[in-house]
Amino acid sequence: MVTYKDAGVDIYEEDRIIRALISKINFEREDAIKPADLKGHYAGAIEFGDYYLVLCTDGVGSKMVVAEMANNFETVPIDMIAMNVNDAICIGAEPVALVDYMAVEEITENIAEQIGKGLNEGIKESNINLIGGETASLPNMIKGIDLAGTVLAVVKKSEIISGQTVKKGDVIVGLRSSGIHSNGLSLARKVFFEISNLNVNSKLSYGKTVADELLTPTRIYVKPVLDMIKKADVKGLAHITGGGFRKLKRLNKEVCYKIDNLPEIPPIFKEIQTLGNVADEEMFKTFNMGIGFCVIVSKENAEKIIEISNQYKIPAFVIGEIEDNIEIDGEFKKETVLVEYNGKKMIME
C-alpha cells in the first residue's frame, strides 16, 4: 500500500522539525505589543489596543507542479489565498489584506497574467486588499515557480474564538470541500503519474480529467463563516488541511472529537485510494475527504449553521460530536480524534 511518506511527505517528521525550530525562539518585545496565547493554533496574533492583529502565511505546495504540467496557472493563486484566509477565520478574525511572494526560475507575460487573474479572483472572494508583494527571479535556486502569501486579519480581543469552550455534547458541522484543495498533492501525483502512468489530460473513471480535479481551487470559507460567527454562538473552527481531522486537536485538547456521520466521500478520493491501494487511515490522515472546514456549536445552533452554509451554496452536515472520552477496544481514550468509516474506527494521531 502506498503512503504519503512514500510520496516524500512525512507529516510526523514535519511536526518534529517545527518543534525543533520553535524551541530556539524565545525573544519577545518588552512593551505593550504582546502576542496572543495561541501557540499551536491556526494563526498568530499580537495585541493592538482593543484588537488582535492576526497573521497567517502559506503557499500552494506541489499543486504548482500540476499547474506547470497543465500550463494552467489561474487557479493556484486562489489556493494560496484560501490557505491563508481559511486559517485566519479559525480564530474568528476577519481577513483584510494580503502580500504575496513569487519566486521564479523564469516566467512569461502570459503566466504572469494568469496568476494576476487568479489573485484578483481570490481577493474578491475573500473581500481583502492586495497591498504589495515581491517577485524574485532565482534561476540558480529553484525550478519552476513557487507562490506564497501572508494575510493580515483583525479581531476584537473580546471576540476571539480559541476553541477552549468546546465541550461534551457540542456537535461538529462539516462544510463541503470543493475537492482535493491544497493538501495531499504529492500523494495524488504519485498515484496518478507514477503508479497509474496517467497524465493531466487523462480521464478518470467518472469522466473528469486529472487536471480538472487536481486544479479545482480550494474553497474560500470567509464569507459564510464570518456570517455564522455573527448569527450563532460558534465555539470552535477548524480548517481541514494537511493531517485531515487531526487539525481538530488545535482547539480544546482536553476533549475528544468523534466523527461518525460523514457524507458520501467525493469520487476524487475514491479514485486515489483505488488506483494507489491506499489504506483508509492514510487517506483520512492525508486528505480532507470531502470536508474542508468544521464549525463546532451546541446542538441547538447546528441547524442555523447548516442553513447559513446552504445560503452560500456550500452543503453542510452534522458529522460528529464532542465527547469527554472515547472507548476503543475496551480502552477509554482522551484528547483524541476518532473517525468511523466503513465500519472501522480510526484514531487520528
From Swiss-Prot:
GO molecular function annotations of the record: ATP binding; phosphoribosylamine-glycine ligase activity; phosphoribosylformylglycinamidine cyclo-ligase activity
Gene Ontology, cellular component aspect: cytosol
EC number: 6.3.3.1
Known catalytic reactions: 2-formamido-N(1)-(5-O-phospho-beta-D-ribosyl)acetamidine + ATP = 5-amino-1-(5-phospho-beta-D-ribosyl)imidazole + ADP + phosphate + H(+)
Presence of keyword ATP-binding: yes
One annotated GO biological process: adenine biosynthetic process
Gene3D superfamilies assigned to the protein according to its UniProt record, in alphabetical order: PurM-like C-terminal domain, PurM-like, N-terminal domain
Pathways involved: Purine metabolism; IMP biosynthesis via de novo pathway; 5-amino-1-(5-phospho-D-ribosyl)imidazole from N(2)-formyl-N(1)-(5-phospho-D-ribosyl)glycinamide: step 2/2
Name this protein carries in UniProt: Phosphoribosylformylglycinamidine cyclo-ligase
One Pfam family matching this protein: AIRS
PANTHER family: TRIFUNCTIONAL PURINE BIOSYNTHETIC PROTEIN ADENOSINE-3 (PTHR10520:SF12), TRIFUNCTIONAL PURINE BIOSYNTHETIC PROTEIN ADENOSINE-3-RELATED (PTHR10520)
Location in the cell: Cytoplasm
Family (UniProt): Belongs to the AIR synthase family.
Presence of keyword Iron: no
NCBIfam families: purM (TIGR00878)
Record key words, sorted: ATP-binding, Cytoplasm, Ligase, Nucleotide-binding, Purine biosynthesis
